Amino acid sequence: MTLNPAPNSFRTGPDERGRFGIFGGRFVAETLMPLILDLEKAYADAKADPSFKADMESYGTHYIGRPSPLYFAERLTEHLRAQAPAGQGAKIFFKREELNHTGSHKVNNVLGQILLARRMGKPRIIAETGAGQHGVATATLCARFGLKCVVYMGAVDVERQAPNVFRMKMLGAEVIPVQSGTRTLKDAMNEALRDWVTNVSDTFYCIGTVAGPHPYPAMVRDFQSVIGIETKQQMLEMEGRLPDSLIACIGGGSNAMGLFHPFLDDRDVEIYGVEAAGHGVQSGLHAASLTGGRPGVLHGNRTYLLMNEDGQIADAHSISAGLDYPGIGPEHAWLHEMGRVTYLSATDAETLEAFKLCSMLEGIIPALEPAHALSKVMELAPTKPAEHLMVLNLSGRGDKDIPQVAQIFGQTL
């Protein structure tokens, strides 16, 4: 008998306490518990209300531009087959979330949370952001619905993501640079939580990933699951069957969970998540929580975290501001321990190679975040048979990264 027998379904979590096995839960200040419970009830009510689903679908179609295309990356497929033994080399598809309004998958979740905030009568929205994509999506939806928007962003990220900072301000958001700690995503989330405790009556906290206290990990996953639901349908239409493998990058892990969740019980579908290895996991300068971390509690949930010997949260590093987080969503931690998803990591250097290759071969400049996953597609695809169907979640476009990448390549803009 195995200690962790595979469950009948990988899609039933979390339990009523918000746990995925030993992960998840809600470790929050007493002040926040009433808010969390209100949110849980409001979300349960919204899920049961056909008008909420109808609004999600209507705005998804007419405002976001869903469904996003599933695209056969023909030249990348040919390029990798040329390096593979005869008869090898997977057929590669991109789920093109970068074509959504605002340029990434983030808007799927924000739409759901903003519609929920309106149902709850909360006129002030706060959010944390790393790469700025979640901040831009939140500012965008707040502008659309006439809500006040405050975005917390680490001061380091404010510098390296200047185009997105300007976008948020153009959309009417107040952007607050966070100077504490490492001045990145973790610290932005800390400040947003402090704000929420202080302004409980009128404020809704729009979390950007599948982390935080319950019900956030499940709620964000549900709003992002449109990615996987569409992929299933599109692949059946294009190829007459399900894909053989899925691959996505992971910071907190919402784009990955959105793609993965609808496929978790399709046991023949291989699933790969790709963390940020920075300068290499052995260097200590990385953001690969599953590869280089251990279980602990941060931002209201128990999950895998980067910690030092004393249990203090360690600094994360990634070339990509959106993956520069010392933790991972609790459902990913559980799927890792259950063995359902294989978690890999990609270095900054591997990511830049993939970024260049995708741009040159497909005419698509990817964000640095999905370029991490793309680097593992370049490794995995040549090892698979030619009939193998592989789907990459192209979760964001690279416009925001052009100044940073140009600087790395020694170009002056």
Curated annotation (Swiss-Prot):
Question: GO molecular function of the protein, one example?
Answer: tryptophan synthase activity
Chloroplast as UniProt keyword:
no
Needed co-factor(s): pyridoxal 5'-phosphate
Gene3D superfamilies the record matches: 3.40.50.1100
Known EC number(s)? 4.2.1.20
Q: How does it assemble?
A: Tetramer of two alpha and two beta chains.
Pathway involvement? Amino-acid biosynthesis; L-tryptophan biosynthesis; L-tryptophan from chorismate: step 5/5
Q: Which Pfam families match?
A: PALP
Tell me the domain of life.
Bacteria
Q: What does this protein do?
A: The beta subunit is responsible for the synthesis of L-tryptophan from indole and L-serine.
Q: Which named protein is this?
A: Tryptophan synthase beta chain
The N6-(pyridoxal phosphate)lysine modification is found at: K106
GO cellular component terms, alphabetically, are: cytoplasm
Q: Which UniProt keywords apply?
A: Amino-acid biosynthesis, Aromatic amino acid biosynthesis, Lyase, Pyridoxal phosphate, Tryptophan biosynthesis
Q: Which reaction does it catalyse?
A: (1S,2R)-1-C-(indol-3-yl)glycerol 3-phosphate + L-serine = D-glyceraldehyde 3-phosphate + L-tryptophan + H2O
Q: Which organism is it from?
A: Methylorubrum extorquens (strain CM4 / NCIMB 13688) (Methylobacterium extorquens)
Spell out the family assignment given in the record's similarity comment: Belongs to the TrpB family.
Q: Where is the signal peptide?
A: none
